[in-house]
Amino acid sequence: MPSGSMSGGVSGPTSPPHPTVPSRPLRPSRYVPVSAATAFLVGSTTLFFCFTCPWLSEQFSVAVPIYNGVMFMFVLANFCMATFMDPGIFPRAEEDEDKEDDFRAPLYKTVEIRGIQVRMKWCSTCRFYRPPRCSHCSVCDNCVEDFDHHCPWVNNCIGRRNYRYFFLFLLSLTAHIMGVFGFGLLFILYHTQQLDRVHSAVTMAVMCVAGLFFIPVAGLTGFHVVLVARGRTTNEQVTGKFRGGVNPFTNGCLRNVSHVLCSSQAPRYLGRKRKAQTVSVQPPFLRPQLTEAQLAAKVLDNGIQGDLHRSKSSLEMMESQSADAEPPPPPKPELRYPGLSRGPAGHSEESSLLNKAPPTPTMFKYRPTYSSPGKNHTALTHAYANQSSQQPGYRSEPSLDGREGGGAERSGAERTGGGPGGPPGSGIPGYSLGGRSYPSFSDPTVLAERASRSSSVRSTHNAPPSEATTSTSYKSLANQTPPQAARNGSLSYDSLLTPSESPDFESAAPEMSPGRPRTPVVGYSSPFLSAQIAHQREAELHQPVASSSALMASPQHAVFLRGSGSPPVPPERERERLLHDSQAQHHHHHHHHHHHHRPPRFSRPPLLSDSGPPQPSYPYRTRSTDTTHPPRSPHPPPLGKSLSYSSAAAAEMQYRLVRKASASVAGGGIQAPKDEIQMKSYSRTNGQPKPSSTPSSPTHPISVSTRPGQAHSSAGSSQSPAHKPGGGVKKVTGVGGTTYEISV
């Protein structure tokens, strides 16, 4: 029977002949149905030929026994083929084949056949993923290709290789049963008077057997005719795999029938004689190297082919990408300013620097990201922040030296590499971090001597961005507002504290620099008042005689003189005196408010350049030495940032302190009411700046401490009654009912 014929397997070079299919135990009950079917088929047909066919051949034709004989032989042949033929058993995986897939393999794999997802299940017995339409027979204990069902009447599984014979067996058996029953009925009709005879009794017995088997066989035949026409198997029909969808294996009725009856025989996977493989073992006893074709692709768990080997360069690139935690820099901005014209002689160096793409400094990966008490902001790269720091001269950082006075000194510092991008070549001791050199400024005498040079060098180099430029670029990035649309935006805290966006400032800037057109500059920049507006307001408020000349020598005036190419430069002594006065005045304010710390009521989020210890606003910044100093020290204490990271807000603070010093000499305490007028007059209405007819002084600077819970007010209590030790809060209502509370 089929048990002996199906015990073959795949034989290795030194393995037993059939190791893949284990020998099944002999169970007599398995052979009962097939034995009964064989007995009824052969016995009834033999009786029919012995007792009925001779009379039929004599009375009607010799073709009757010939027809029945051919049909019986066809039935018997198909029965034997369906019983003894291999249905398409897949050999089981050997141990060395499935050891890498058995434990980590998922339960299912999904493949796509004609656009339809078909699931392949993992067979734990055979240890491989069963192909589509394959199933494991529980009786035969084998995975059968195109499994239809296990037929007990033939004692074999019906699969791809023997389904044709099983189907033909059903068809021929049905026809044979009908022929036997019909010809037997014909014999009885002619011998109704002789029913007691042996021939009539045997013929009626054969008719009873044929009639008994005709109903189930005819029903099974009709069922399989439908399955063949629809291109399905019994297993698919019973389990209902394609009951509510489309069968991807059907090719139409005619093609399905022709595929079952006329297709070529499927190959057999068991019992193949394989040649012995000779493997040459090398001296280190290593496995032979696999070829590229063997390593080309492997079907992954989801059915997708993936490459198993990667080149060395791709692995190194993946390792470098995983090791580098710094995000990639944004695309380089095209630094073009509409309507910006530079002088042909004095501005060639700055124009070339503006056209260069801002580099991403190495210090960025060592600087911590900023955090806010209530918000989480995206980290800002220096490539984006440098865009706002490379603004035109009349909006860039202030400098204490003029074009003529500092030109040679700055060019000498650039040649010797004294800028932030090179080593300190001007005789200033410094330190190096991340490939960049930074001066340390431990001598107080060097501090005052190098202050003006630092501002000019810093404004012309591609240094890391300052605090003010980082603040403005951070705000523009956080608001996601382009520079053109920012002019028409809603009321913001920047417009309240930045009077530089008013029409007066836009019109006054070209007057101070006649070489530039009147086109307003696009984008945010450091909020500074022009020197001319400051001079007019100071004259209207206090009419000082001495302070006007002092204000014209202020650092902000020096910036506009540099931008317009004007020759007047404050002398060295006057500049040192202004530095000394502003520092002493700021020391007075700083120590006066030292014991009145309170949490900021309205402050901007800390930036990348704000991380570290709290920094009072000074005209320049040096490296921190963490040493205490007397309140009346002629030089300010060093701070926790290098020279290249000094901010424009510090220069703005110096400029306002010089203004306050001159205002305190001339006018006294009338500045606070004007501050409130100025604060409200430069607010925006419907996105447009609204100038005020009343001239006012600059706003009080609000210096925000980076320590949580502390804020230092930089305005002294002697300047205005609004700046008392207890402090106060200004409330400004904007468009849409938004109320801004500003700590002063």
Curated annotation (Swiss-Prot):
PROSITE patterns: DHHC (PS50216). It comes from the Eukaryota. Its main location: membrane. It catalyses: L-cysteinyl-[protein] + hexadecanoyl-CoA = S-hexadecanoyl-L-cysteinyl-[protein] + CoA. Residues 369-393, 460-501 have a biased composition (Polar residues). Residues 585-601 have a biased composition (Basic residues). Residues 1-30, 83-167, 230-744 are cytoplasmic. Residues 398-413, 571-584 have a biased composition (Basic and acidic residues). The DHHC domain is required for palmitoyltransferase activity. Belongs to the DHHC palmitoyltransferase family. ERF2/ZDHHC9 subfamily. This is Palmitoyltransferase ZDHHC5-A.
